[in-house]
């Protein structure tokens, strides 16, 4: 099976909607019966183990870890769908070839460096937003709903699923573009590593931030 056009461009490819119908069986190589079963179990609140991790000075971080089969399916979606989609260059977290070090390198020798942490980052990304992201990327509505359903838990993006970091990068693409463009106008730089946003540049950038 040949690699289809980049998923982000499927909307401009003739017959893209027909390709969606065979996505699970031919491209992801997942049995539709298995997909239906997993979606049913997720809707019933199954297939995830939820626990909390204590953080000094912060609220505990809630982790929802998928079971072995669901995690396998999510990794397949990550590799064959999500990683074929384009994210913004300002995103450095969970991206091949980028790291916390490449993120920090963008802010060396700057007069002002400010780091902000987005509160409850993953839980604020809802099923509706994930579903919308897949639809805007060219998937038919029913396929987008199934993909979003396999990647969400209790209506939100779970921290602990292998698909969540890349989905968050794709969801934040517009935000990353707007903040990057704004900082550039003032001679500054913006990057994001997961839920950590960093702004740097001359003192003028202080007027842009709600500090």
Identify the residue ranges that each predicted region occupies.
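Non-catalytic, polymerase-adjacent accessory regions of viral genome-replication enzymes
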Residues: 1-51
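Nucleotide/phosphate-binding site architecture used for ATP/NTP-dependent chemistry
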Residues: 17-22, 30, 61, 68-70, ...
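N-terminal low-complexity, intrinsically disordered segments
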Residues: 18-35, 79-81, 85, 125, ...
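Short linear loop/turn motifs
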Residues: 38-44, 93-96, 145-152
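Short amphipathic beta-strand starts and helix->beta connectors
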Residues: 46-48, 98-100, 182-186
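Short, conserved non-catalytic motifs in the polymerase core
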Residues: 49-74, 93-95, 115, 149-168
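Active-site-proximal segment of RNA-dependent polymerases
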Residues: 70-115, 120-121
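Conserved polymerase palm-domain catalytic core
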Residues: 106-194, 198-211
